[in-house]
Amino acid sequence: MERATFAAGCFWGVEAAFSKVEGVISTKVGYTGGTLKDPTYKDVSTGSTGHAESIDIIFDESVITYGELLEVLWNTHDPTTKDSQGPDHGSQYRSAIFYHDDAQREAALRSREQLERSGKYDSTIKTEIVKASEFSPAEDYHQKYFQKLQFKR
């Protein structure tokens, strides 16, 4: 099993998208890229901790590659906006790829460059590519949020 960590705006929708992908074993939403140890949603919402709402993915590379997960990421959000996605604004909603090893870093750089050259967007890609730091899981009520909403209906 391999691990991938991405940020692409509000983590609820990102988790919903990745949880449906064949080869994804598990997803967990949380916070990464910041300075505060064990941040809460309230902490991260201030925009002062440096954390991004993110998703930690465990996947089976014999079923889906890291490169294919990057394609899902690019199609899940607008990578040309800085610190915002849709109605959500602030550095906690930034677009980022948190790589876990050199192979992931290289794949992310290549993928971002290919997307830039594709002409799909008029603006430049703002997605950060940074070394993964500690991932802190979000509170339970954030986990599988959209799935929980479906069960309540």
UniProtKB/Swiss-Prot annotation:
Listed EC numbers: 1.8.4.11
The protein's name: Peptide methionine sulfoxide reductase MsrA
Annotated active site: 10
Similarity comment text for this entry: Belongs to the MsrA Met sulfoxide reductase family.
GO biological process assignments: protein modification process
Record gene name: msrA
Database matches in InterPro entries: Met_Sox_Rdtase_MsrA_dom, Met_Sox_Rdtase_MsrA_sf
Stored HAMAP family: MsrA
SUPFAM superfamilies: Peptide methionine sulfoxide reductase
Keywords: Oxidoreductase
A Pfam family it matches: PMSR
Record-level Gene Ontology MF annotations: L-methionine:thioredoxin-disulfide S-oxidoreductase activity; peptide-methionine (S)-S-oxide reductase activity
Catalytic activity: L-methionyl-[protein] + [thioredoxin]-disulfide + H2O = L-methionyl-(S)-S-oxide-[protein] + [thioredoxin]-dithiol; [thioredoxin]-disulfide + L-methionine + H2O = L-methionine (S)-S-oxide + [thioredoxin]-dithiol
Lineage: Archaea, Methanobacteriati, Methanobacteriota, Stenosarchaea group, Methanomicrobia
Source organism of the structure: Methanococcoides burtonii (strain DSM 6242 / NBRC 107633 / OCM 468 / ACE-M)
Cited function: Has an important function as a repair enzyme for proteins that have been inactivated by oxidation. Catalyzes the reversible oxidation-reduction of methionine sulfoxide in proteins to methionine.
UniProt entry tagged with the keyword Iron: no
